[in-house]
Amino acid sequence: MSEYKNALPRLHQRYEDVLKKQLREQFGYANELQVPKLEKIVLNMGVGEAAGDQKKLDAAVAEMTVISGQKPVKTLARKAIAGFKIREGLPIGCKVTLRRARMYEFLDRLVTIAMPRIRDFRGLPANKGFDGHGNFAMGIKEQIVFPEIEYDKIDAVRGMDIIFVTSAKSDAEAKALLKAFDLPFNG
């Protein structure tokens, strides 16, 4: 039997071995289960042009699959908007929810490979993006920052939203957790 069969992703191992203890000391938790943890990462890509051309949505789904390693689900319009030629129930985007090993592997690639490739990147805003309940949302303007996407094979540059859902009770706890995972906050 291989010793790597049940190996944890690098960041998950670091969380279990080092970060849990650090966060417990920093916030003075009495119980180890109180320590905030990353529960899921949601990637969302809105494709407005999909209303007129479903091929654009299919291309976005393919790109999201390559980036996340998991097939996304198409999101449907909740209500009709005549000005944008959108009918209720029309597919206009895609999203994928990453948990467990895939979540930690995506976070590792995001922090070590994708973020350094963002042009004029000076870090994430320290006080924006938190929702007051321990979750953090950020946006990426170009999907080409991920090395899995080949620049020659894309039809359009698309952005995406990345939402980090944590078990933290406050924004300060969530920020400390994400900072411990090396997310580059500028403040």
Curated annotation (Swiss-Prot):
Assigned keywords, A-Z: Ribonucleoprotein, Ribosomal protein, RNA-binding, rRNA-binding, tRNA-binding
Molecular function GO labels: rRNA binding; structural constituent of ribosome; tRNA binding
Pfam families: Ribosomal_L5, Ribosomal_L5_C
Entry keyword rRNA-binding: yes
A single GO BP: translation
Gene3D superfamilies in the cross-refs: 3.30.1440.10
Coiled coil feature spans: none
GO cellular component: ribonucleoprotein complex; ribosome
Domain of life: Bacteria
Annotated HAMAP family: Ribosomal_uL5_B
Assembly, per entry: Part of the 50S ribosomal subunit; part of the 5S rRNA/L5/L18/L25 subcomplex. Contacts the 5S rRNA and the P site tRNA. Forms a bridge to the 30S subunit in the 70S ribosome.
Function per UniProt: This is one of the proteins that bind and probably mediate the attachment of the 5S RNA into the large ribosomal subunit, where it forms part of the central protuberance. In the 70S ribosome it contacts protein S13 of the 30S subunit (bridge B1b), connecting the 2 subunits; this bridge is implicated in subunit movement. Contacts the P site tRNA; the 5S rRNA and some of its associated proteins might help stabilize positioning of ribosome-bound tRNAs.
NCBIfam families (UniProt xref): PRK00010.1
Similarity comment text for this entry: Belongs to the universal ribosomal protein uL5 family.
Protein name, per record: Large ribosomal subunit protein uL5
The organism of origin for this protein: Gluconobacter oxydans (strain 621H) (Gluconobacter suboxydans)
